Structure formats: C-alpha cells, structure tokens
C-alpha cells in the first residue's frame, strides 16, 4: 500500500503565511500526496504551485464550526471551485445534528449534492461531539444523498479521529460512501491503523512524520 495515495495534506491554521504555504506545498509535491486541503483564500496560491502535478485541491467550507446557512455554504463552494478547487470539505451544521433535526440535516446534504454533482464532496461531522447514534444517522443521510466521503473531524474540537469512530462509519456506509479520518493524526503507525479500520483518506498536517 502506498500511504501517500491516501493523504489529504492540510494547512488550515489561521496564521499560516505565504512562506509557510509555499514550503508546505513543496513538501507535498515531494511526498506526492493525493490532495492538499486549504482555506478558500489560499486556493489560488496552491493551484499555481501544483499546476504541473496531479495533486488535487480541496477547499474548506463553513470551517471549522459548520454554522453557516446552506445558501452561504453553496456560495462558498462556488467560490472555491472558481478559484481552482476540485474537491470540497464542508462542515455539517452540528447544532442541527445535536437537535436531531434530521430533516434540516438531510436538506443541507441534498441541496449541496444537487448543486454540485461532479465534484468530490466530503462532509465533516465532528464525531467527538456526537453520540454513536448521531454518527450512524449522519452517515445514513450522507449515503442517501450520495456524498462521496464522511469525515470525522475538523481538528479544531476536543478530539480528532479515533479507530472506533472510523470502524463505525465504515460499517454504516459500507461501500456506498468513503470514510476520511482527520484530526490528531501525527504518526505513520496511527495513519496505517486508520486505513486498516476503513479510512480511504487521511487528513493530516504532519506530512513529514506520516510519510517518513
């Protein structure tokens, strides 16, 4: 297995400078990662650096809290694509999930999928804030709406990916959707364990350590 093919390299800290971004993307090119995930304002910069590679760009949407309206999320996705992204990592409305307002959760997923049928869409649940039943329900709604990935975490809450959550998500989505693990993945061994548990993408900023 080539672990680099699973890696979504992330640089999402708010104080990342252009110098840091350039160095990070250069490392991503050397390591030949699958995708680079950045904030919307940095997409164009990354696109220029990787223009002669096969690396994808994913833009984050309503990150990290997910509390924008669906209309705003759709507009942000449009802007990400205009700037050069070809994948999207959007944060679900966590409040609606905790309220068990599944109609609103479904409506958001449905409107986003129907608006963008031909790009890879990953939905972030922030699993550390959810019960097992809530994770299951979110996965079922994601599958129903044909989202491409269910994703564990933003990396900005109290905990990141766990083996248990990845196994649970994989069990629910089966082969109808894929699982992305992210948050707190700082070693190669942990990344490999998550892949073994069912993750098909690994989101990490620790590229040198994970791909050593």
From Swiss-Prot:
Q: What are the GO BP annotations of this UniProt entry?
A: 2-deoxyribose 1-phosphate catabolic process; carbohydrate catabolic process; deoxyribonucleotide catabolic process
Cross-referenced SUPFAM superfamilies, in alphabetical order? Answer: Aldolase (SSF51569)
Q: Which GO terms describe its cellular component?
A: cytoplasm
- Superkingdom per UniProt: Bacteria
Pathway given for this chain reads: Carbohydrate degradation; 2-deoxy-D-ribose 1-phosphate degradation; D-glyceraldehyde 3-phosphate and acetaldehyde from 2-deoxy-alpha-D-ribose 1-phosphate: step 2/2
Q: Which Gene3D superfamilies match?
A: Aldolase class I
Q: What does this protein do?
A: Catalyzes a reversible aldol reaction between acetaldehyde and D-glyceraldehyde 3-phosphate to generate 2-deoxy-D-ribose 5-phosphate.
Q: What is the protein name stated in its UniProt record?
A: Deoxyribose-phosphate aldolase 2
């Amino acid at each position: 297995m080539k672990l680099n093919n699973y890696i979504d390299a992330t640089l999402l800290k708010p104080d990342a400078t252009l110098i840091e971004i350039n160095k990070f993307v250069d490392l991503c090119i050397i390591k030949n990662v699958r995708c680079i995930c950045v904030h919307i304002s940095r997409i164009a910069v990354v696109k220029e650096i990787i223009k002669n590679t096969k690396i994808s760009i994913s833009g984050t949407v309503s990150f990290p809290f997910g509390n924008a309206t669906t209309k705003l999320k759709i507009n942000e996705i449009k802007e990400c694509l205009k700037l050069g992204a070809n994948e999207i990592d959007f944060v679900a409305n966590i409040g609606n999930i905790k309220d068990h307002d599944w109609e609103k959760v479904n409506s958001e997923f449905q409107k986003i999928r129907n608006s963008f049928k031909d790009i890879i869409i990953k939905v972030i649940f922030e699993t550390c804030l959810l019960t097992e039943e809530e994770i299951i329900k979110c996965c079922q709604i994601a599958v129903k709406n044909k989202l491409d990935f269910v994703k564990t975490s933003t990396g900005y809450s109290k905990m990141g990916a766990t083996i248990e959550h990845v196994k649970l998500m994989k069990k629910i989505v089966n082969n109808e959707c894929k699982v992305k693990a992210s948050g707190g993945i700082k070693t190669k061994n942990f990344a490999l364990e998550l892949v073994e548990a069912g993750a098909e993408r690994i989101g990490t900023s620790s590229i040198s350590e994970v791909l050593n």
